[in-house]
């Protein structure tokens, strides 16, 4: 999964192309070696201790965090302290930057880069929890918002993606994709036309044909 897009989006880079990029290879060996080298160059050849790992109090997130904790220790000798908090408290701490490491909660209303690029990565984006700022990326956003030609927008998206790869705002972990199902007597739902889960989906017209 790329930094910039949902992997199931029409804007996403094809999987075979993504696999050629550093950090997206099928096996992690090369990435781990590079990470160790970068840590050594930064003065942490022996690893890190006491990293504050902020995690929302939810079974699936706790499980992911524990797995990440083990992988960081085994691969890079980075020791983290899990700090479990209620979901509401997590948002407060995340917005305030009170963490060293956390599993984010980025979502969007539309499957369009104008929506999620501004929300996730713009200077004052509501979900830019790392407070990331890149001037070149910021200049691309209004161009992307105004461009109506899809091919030209794809070019802008690739440019934005290249900037994110050179200067990562975050590390992608996973995307949630939900499959919809309904009884045949429920009429009108068309999953192709909506996106998201309970917080963004609204059926304006639906009926039961029984």
Tell where the protein language model's regions lie, with residue ranges.
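Acidic/histidine-enriched alpha-helical segments
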Residues: 51-52, 83-92, 178
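Short beta-strand and adjacent tight-turn residues that come in two discontinuous sequence segments
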Residues: 81, 85, 103-105
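Short strand-loop junctions, especially beta-strand C-caps/beta-turns
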Residues: 54-58, 85, 147
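Detector for C-terminal structural segments
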Residues: 1-17, 59-71, 91-210
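Short, well-ordered beta-strand elements
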Residues: 48-57, 81
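Immediate post-signal peptide segment of exported/extracytoplasmic ligand-binding proteins
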Residues: 32-52
